[in-house]
């Protein structure tokens, strides 16, 4: 038996089962009926939807390719990481952070919080189960979700989940972005994506090139310096660097508050004026600002400003060097667009992540080619034919939580309405279905 909340489940798919003719290939794999939604992904977004459904008494199942919840946080983040925003903007619905947690919890505290969240709502994902494809079957009006489950020493097993609703909760950061630099294969030194970076201890005394100047690139560069390395950070394009706090108040919170009372352009001008007072002119350190303000840039393009947590003073003093774009790599060196050639020992690619939705969600017009819903926040959580999305707002955990509540509420209403049309008895199961939920 698979799934959660089984005691409360009501079979609302019996009418579809009765309509399916004998011999239909809808049961070509080991098949599992799900009487509620299938949630793909057990990160914060998937957990938030699951908790909302639990509160509504709606059965569901979560499929997670990793062996744990929040695998991005557990397996692909560096040790010194802390939340960049105050905890009240990062908590999931209906479950605040513990009072004793600091304003900016550590990575390990956040993982602890998520594990407590899952335990509190009795959320039990199916781990080590990778979705190969999900496709809406127009003939039967159902979703067909095909997976491969890694069962350890028992090998792997293929399943097909049949459901009325599917929630895509794999998020914006499912796959690493690894640029194809000329000559990188001949470099000969250590090359690592920031997702595999844990600590700068192994780089003591080494010259390290950090490619990327977002929050990860800045923080990795600072961590490298603190561990005795000599970091150089590649900055190809304009970037907004802001203080994490302005006069003791979170910059993010200040921006949110200002936008309630003034237009975005004025809020941007105010924040940039205050940032210049605190940080100085970042242009002269090689960190040129974009032409449009940080709040407008975030709203239009989803680009997050860098919140400085200590890297900028090291950049000012030259302890973290800023270098321009890359032309190509060579044996133990890199050639830059300004003509300089740097000798380096290691490369860390702080080049970010992307959605992997296009690789498995088939025949849909809801997501763009880059795996993000075409409709921007706050209208990007609901598609057609029972398709939902959470974690693609480009507004972090706060935006994901808002979408999760909308999704859970909408599915619960539809599930309850369909439940009324069914007899509240155990429904007949198709003879070829190996399990029922």
UniProtKB/Swiss-Prot annotation:
Q: Which cofactor does it need?
A: FAD
Q: Which GO terms fall under biological process for this protein?
A: auxin biosynthetic process; response to ethylene
Q: Which pathway features in its UniProt record?
A: Plant hormone metabolism; auxin biosynthesis
**InterPro entries per UniProt:** Auxin_biosynth/cation_transpt (IPR050982), FAD/NAD-bd_sf (IPR036188), Flavin_mOase-like (IPR020946)
Q: Which transformation does this protein catalyse, written as a reaction?
A: indole-3-pyruvate + NADPH + O2 + H(+) = (indol-3-yl)acetate + CO2 + NADP(+) + H2O
| UniProtKB keywords | Auxin biosynthesis, FAD, Flavoprotein, Monooxygenase, NADP, Oxidoreductase
NADP among the record's keywords?
yes
E.C. number: 1.14.13.168
Residues bound to FAD are: 41-46
A GO molecular function for this record?
NADP binding
Q: Specify one Pfam family.
A: FMO-like
Q: Which residues bind NADP(+)?
A: 212-217
Q: What does this protein do?
A: Involved in auxin biosynthesis. Belongs to the set of redundant YUCCA genes probably responsible for auxin biosynthesis in roots.
Family listed: Belongs to the FMO family.
What name goes with this protein? Probable indole-3-pyruvate monooxygenase YUCCA3
Q: Which organism is it from?
A: Arabidopsis thaliana (Mouse-ear cress)
The lineage, from the top, is: Eukaryota, Viridiplantae, Streptophyta, Embryophyta, Tracheophyta
UniProt lists the gene as: YUC3
């Amino acid at each position: 038996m698979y799934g959660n909340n089984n005691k409360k489940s009501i079979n609302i798919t019996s009418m579809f089962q009765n309509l399916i003719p004998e011999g239909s290939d809808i049961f070509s794999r080991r098949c599992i009926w799900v009487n509620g939604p299938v949630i793909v992904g057990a990160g914060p977004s998937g957990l938030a939807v699951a908790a909302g459904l639990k509160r509504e008494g709606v059965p569901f199942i979560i499929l997670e390719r990793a062996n744990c919840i929040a695998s991005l946080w557990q397996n692909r983040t560096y040790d010194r990481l802390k939340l960049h925003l105050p905890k009240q903007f990062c908590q999931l619905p209906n479950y605040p952070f513990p009072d004793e947690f600091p304003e900016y919890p550590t990575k390990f505290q956040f993982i602890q919080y998520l594990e407590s969240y899952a335990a509190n709502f009795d959320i039990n994902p199916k781990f080590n189960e990778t979705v190969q494809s999900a496709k809406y079957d127009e003939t039967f009006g159902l979703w067909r979700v095909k997976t491969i489950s890694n069962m350890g020493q028992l090998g792997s097993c293929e399943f097909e989940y049949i459901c009325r609703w599917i929630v895509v909760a794999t998020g914006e950061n499912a796959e690493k972005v690894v640029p194809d630099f000329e000559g990188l294969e001949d470099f000969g030194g250590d090359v690592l994506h920031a997702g595999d970076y844990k600590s700068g201890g192994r780089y003591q005394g080494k010259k390290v090139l950090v490619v990327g100047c977002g929050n990860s690139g800045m923080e990795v560069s600072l961590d490298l310096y603190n561990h005795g390395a000599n970091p150089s950070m590649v900055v190809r394009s304009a970037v907004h660097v802001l203080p994490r706090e302005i006069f003791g108040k979170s910059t993010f919170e200040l921006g949110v508050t200002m936008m309630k009372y003034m237009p975005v352009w004025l809020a941007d001008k105010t924040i940039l004026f205050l940032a210049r007072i605190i940080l100085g002119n970042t242009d002269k350190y090689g960190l040129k600002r974009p032409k449009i303000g940080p709040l407008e840039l975030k709203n239009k393009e989803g680009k997050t400003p860098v919140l400085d947590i200590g890297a900028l003073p090291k950049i000012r003093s030259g302890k973290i060097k800023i270098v321009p774009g890359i032309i190509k790599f060579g044996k133990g060196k890199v050639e830059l667009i300004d003509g300089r050639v740097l000798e380096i020992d290691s490369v860390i690619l702080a080049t970010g992540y992307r959605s992997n939705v296009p690789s498995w969600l088939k025949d849909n017009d809801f997501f763009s080619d880059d795996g993000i819903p075409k409709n921007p926040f706050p209208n990007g959580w609901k598609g057609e034919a029972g398709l939902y999305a959470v974690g693609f707002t480009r507004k972090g955990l706060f935006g994901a939580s808002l979408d999760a509540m909308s999704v859970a509420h909408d599915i619960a209403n539809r599930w309850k309405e369909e439940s009324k049309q069914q007899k509240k008895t155990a429904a007949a199961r198709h003879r070829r279905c190996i399990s029922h939920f």
